[in-house]
Amino acid sequence: MSNSHPLRPFTAVGEIDHVHILSEHIGALLIGEEYGDVTFVVEKKRFPAHRVILAARCQYFRALLYGGMRESQPEAEIPLQDTTAEAFTMLLRYIYTGRATLTDEKEEVLLDFLSLAHKYGFPELEDSTSEYLCTILNIQNVCMTFDVASLYSLPKLTCMCCMFMDRNAQEVLASDGFLSLSKTALLNIVLRDSFAAPEKDIFLALLNWCKHNAKENHAEIMQAVRLPLMSLTELLNVVRPSGLLSPDAILDAIKVRSESRDMDLNYRGMLIPEENIATMKYGAQVVKGELKSALLDGDTQNYDLDHGFSRHPIDDDCRSGIEIKLGQPSIINHIRLLLWDRDSRSYSYFIEVSMDELDWIRVIDHSHYLCRSWQKLYFPARVCRYIRIVGTHNTVNKIFHIVAFECMFTNKAFTLEKGLIAPMENVATIADCASVIEGVSRSRNALLNGDTKNYDWDSGYTCHQLGSGAIVVQLAQPYMIGSIRLLLWDCDDRSYSYYVEVSTNQQQWTMVADRTKVSCKSWQSVTFERQPASFIRIVGTHNTANEVFHCVHFECPEQQSTQKEDSSEEPGTGDLSTPSQQLDPHAPRAPSASSLPPSPGPNLHSPNQQNQ
């Protein structure tokens, strides 16, 4: 047998895969003119081809060559005016073999090749070529690549070009490719808030573009310049002599600059989605506060009473604070910070942003809420250079402590009401730093661990004595909550009564559900008018079996309904490996549930003991 063919790909026994041989043989038809029945002429170069192969691979050629038009005549010659011979050679090779080599071609040829893939309807080729172009973007080719990507509505390539230009704005403005941009592509670039070059540089680049493209409407181009961001000197000595903007436009810009708050100006800022920019990598630094070095070091594990955090004293006039200076003006809409959480303390605080350290805009106000541990904060996107966190309360002392700080722009969708997140997903989870601060359980946060299957007479629930205490869940931060869901212990036929209250400070409570006169079993869905909540208190008032209220699972807001899957499971089959510190569902009495017991203790009665 012949050994001339390369190693074949592995195939399963009973399967033959000789696609590579088929590709080689069909591709060989391109080398000579045998069997050719149509000829394309590109830049005076003739390309013999085979109608049936072209038609089989492409709807465009099927219509062209078999649609009854002039091109469908035998031995027809078809001139192509909108491409180059190099790009068409690459396309024919791809049509015949399914292969294309991009690495050795110039950017201009690759863009022509991409245009052909789009025109003739090869979406896979279009995607693959776009992906390769994303990897070779540079200052010299990004503008013409963006022009083509915009023309053919290629979202991934367009996005990558924009990100590259945003991060290299001044170099792009000075490149030759910038002068060759179409008007539409040009405006799409400079109108972006994230195209963060100095406004003077943008104006001068647009001025050069107008000189290079004298036939275009210069007034429309100049409207893209954000004149109020330029200094008075720049307006008078750079903009005014150009003659492209009217004196009224310049005077209006001066008026806006002098009468507006600085933070109301339409600033440009760096945009790096989904990446923390409060790092030394991006030039961020802590400029105010005590123990500055700990805040941005990225260590969220090694901290205690003495080290691993930044701090400031809490005073009544809120003059103290911790201030971070970013490496450059940046667009952010998301902040994550870790409040010191080695005990049960809570904090209150607010966050402000600024461009000049003089005019501050408050983006987060949790000064009237109790918060703990990780804070996941969202707000409308802002351009800022400085971020200030001011603590207003600590439930233990007069010092505000932050272990870690992150800020970024996120594309994650979020809903805000009255400045607070209205979550769609369950935020009463251990991962979201929620905790059970009142109630008795074998495991401190069994109520929040998401396990709705493994519970029985002895484990898997949280409880409190009727008439004494409650079950209280603290969320890490305030949310706008309009629903909760509970799973009441349901291993027998008992029923419960209860009510639910919410609070933001543990002082004032609002009742959101009153089921004290209702017999309730198993899953409970509670909906109410959406309102701020940091604490949820569940108070049992009746149990038909004994004097203890038992809850297996809690979530807020309510998620998709799930039920205990194996309804045939008998009590007593759950995991009993954890040391017990619970109240037995059948026990007639129980110790005070006002706080979590510090150490395990035995069950009070056997599972079968009932109230008499």
UniProtKB/Swiss-Prot annotation:
Biased composition (Low complexity): 589-612
GO biological process: adult locomotory behavior; circadian behavior; circadian sleep/wake cycle, non-REM sleep; long-term memory; modulation of chemical synaptic transmission; multicellular organismal-level iron ion homeostasis; regulation of synaptic vesicle endocytosis; sensory perception of temperature stimulus
Domain BTB: 36-104
Superkingdom per UniProt: Eukaryota
Domain BACK positions: 142-240
Region (Disordered): 559-612
Gene3D superfamilies xref list: 1.25.40.420, Galactose-binding domain-like, Potassium Channel Kv1.1, Chain A
Tissue/organ expression: Detected throughout the gray matter of the spinal cord including the motor neurons (at protein level). In the brain, detected in the neurons of the hippocampus and in the Purkinje cells of the cerebellum (at protein level). Also detected in the terospenial cortex, bed nucleus of the stria terminalis (BST) and the ventrolateral thalamus (VL) (at protein level).
GO cellular component, one term: cytoplasm
PROSITE patterns, alphabetized: BTB
PANTHER family: BTB/POZ DOMAIN-CONTAINING PROTEIN 9, BTB_POZ DOMAIN-CONTAINING PROTEIN 9
Official protein name in the record: BTB/POZ domain-containing protein 9
Annotated source species: Rattus norvegicus (Rat)
